[in-house]
Amino acid sequence: MIGRLRFRLSKHFGAKNVLDDFALEVRGGEFVTFLGPSGCGKSTALNLLAGLLPPTSGEIWLDEERLDPRPPERRGFGMVFQNYALFPHLSVFDNVAFGLHVRRVTRATVADRVRRMLGLVKLDGLETRYPGQLSGGQQQRVAIARALVIEPRVLLLDEPLSNLDAKLRLEMRAEIKRLHQELGLTSIYVTHDQGEALSLSDRIVVMREGRVLQVGTPAEIHDRPRTVFVADFVGYRNLLPVTVTARGADGLVTAEGGGVRVRGRGDVALGASVLAAIRPEDVSLGDDLHGAGAARGTVRLVEYQGREYDVEITLDSGAIVKARTAATPKVGSVVGVTLDASRIVLLPAEDHV
């Protein structure tokens, strides 16, 4: 296992700054995810680490070795691509063995390592099949086996589950986590899916327009987003404009606006215009209108999600609140809405676009 991977990288395409002074240190054995929307620079960062793109400026260090001057094949990294990138004319065995042949590994060692890796990814018995004879999930397992068989110092995964259906995504997500833990890998994963990031990662790097907005554990990103963009991206679908009116000794901040009075957490100044961010699952519906965070509204939309319903309510003030509930409210009914103060995060409004 490596000690640490550290880098500081920038990348420009003409006048466009795709990656702006992206600096990070990854510890050996860590699973780090670059999370962000399309075009945020996350895949560019991964390609720079892999050596598939040259940086405009910056350095990559693995322990005491500088890697950025080296070609991809001399960095010791394994790469899993979004589109699998399997060779259609090669069998499963030969696809997995390809990197070992490039490294001139002996035939006996190749056979042993390929069979062991196919067993790890549960593809025993499929050695002679071709990619066109495999399901999407099986093709992805071949791609993962090919990246792992070279015993990479770092495993890079570029949105590897995006082409799979929902059921297969869940299965392969669990498989990737199992392999990471079982083999003691150091992994860097790219995705736009917050669910993947939260379930797989030791740390998450949230990115936007080539910049890092927040780095933290899944719990820190989920519970304590630092900006409105991060909050919105990881599921805080309610962003209510309010003004800070008081700070309590208990650490909670009181804010009011749009007919709503809320209490929540946040490093915000008295009198500041802020956004009260809260997830739909932390909004409850009922008749009780006592205390901060309570208001009355009318149900405008109900969407069935299996065990629960997504409900959109227009408050008497005109503000719109989204809730997730096990109850079955009717469109047009009047309900009480309560925002859980312990789950509200108050964030500066200036970065909301």
Residue spans for each PLM region:
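ABC ATPase nucleotide-binding domain
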Residues: 25, 61, 336-338
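ABC ATPase nucleotide-binding domains
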Residues: 31, 70-78, 82, 86-229
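ABC ATPase nucleotide-binding domain helices that frame the ATP-binding cleft
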Residues: 43-46, 142
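Helix-to-loop junction immediately C-terminal to a conserved catalytic motif
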Residues: 50
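Non-catalytic connector elements of ABC transporters
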Residues: 237-239, 247-353
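The feature captures the beta-strand-to-loop junction immediately N-terminal to the Walker
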Residues: 35-37
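Conserved ABC transporter NBD signature motif
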Residues: 58-66
